């Protein structure tokens, strides 16, 4: 085969790939949502600028105690939207934050996204909001931040609610392992689309029927914001269990009343981690939800909310 014909075929292959990506709504052809814009913004959507980062959060005022809800990896305040009405119905003052790099918050490139840095930034946000002695509920990565906050800033937390929490070494999910590959950010940007979101959600849910078009759209829109893919790749690359080992060794020091809530069929952080938290925490209650995956607050919101409320009220 002549070099001329070979070059022609290579060009044709690139053109074909370009067209396939274009018509499938992948990476380079996805419209980016500018920072600071929230489609369908609600009255509870708020922003605050702290250290040059514009943080998005939700606030639902109430006469009861402050409950602070913190999301996991590649997630946002959206993950709590089905649980919040039950909590506000009890009169609690509910807060939920998009950490730097997540949801509708800014996703700067000139920064780091490791867990300890995120914890320090959450603490700074709580200072600005004037929050202390909150009921701190964290899912996945948010649970790890809750644990670090309890150890480093005990004045910020009262009761703890760990929902399928990160903390102990585990086998990283595929999407996080992918971030360790060379040129991961560029590859993700090229192929990212609704199909990636759908595939990932089906990993974290036990019941595939819960992965609705509305849910896919909610995650996809937030991951389509400016610098989102960069921020999530940087966060995934920075997940370092060795760096956190000095903290996980101190978990037995925590004396806060703690609810450990786990989806029995969690494919991202297995139930073994839930049992380990139960063993290491002195003042804990472990509740396991059958036929439930990594995000009980989305898959079984009514049950999750009832368990949370009973725990908060001491029932």
Please provide the spans of the model-predicted regions.
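Alpha/beta-hydrolase fold catalytic core
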Residues: 2-65, 89-92, 131, 313-315
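Active-site loop/oxyanion-hole signature of alpha/beta-hydrolase fold enzymes
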Residues: 50-51, 58, 89, 99-137, ...
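Conserved HGGG/HGGXW glycine-rich cap/lid loop of the alpha/beta-hydrolase fold
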Residues: 60-104
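Flexible "cap/lid" loop of the alpha/beta hydrolase fold
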Residues: 151, 160-190
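Conserved alpha/beta-hydrolase catalytic His-Asp/Glu region
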Residues: 177, 191-252
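Short beta-strand/loop motif that positions the catalytic acidic residue
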Residues: 254, 260-262
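Acidic catalytic loop of the alpha/beta-hydrolase fold
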Residues: 265-269
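Catalytic active-site module of serine/aspartate enzymes centered on a nucleophile-bearing elbow/loop
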Residues: 284-315
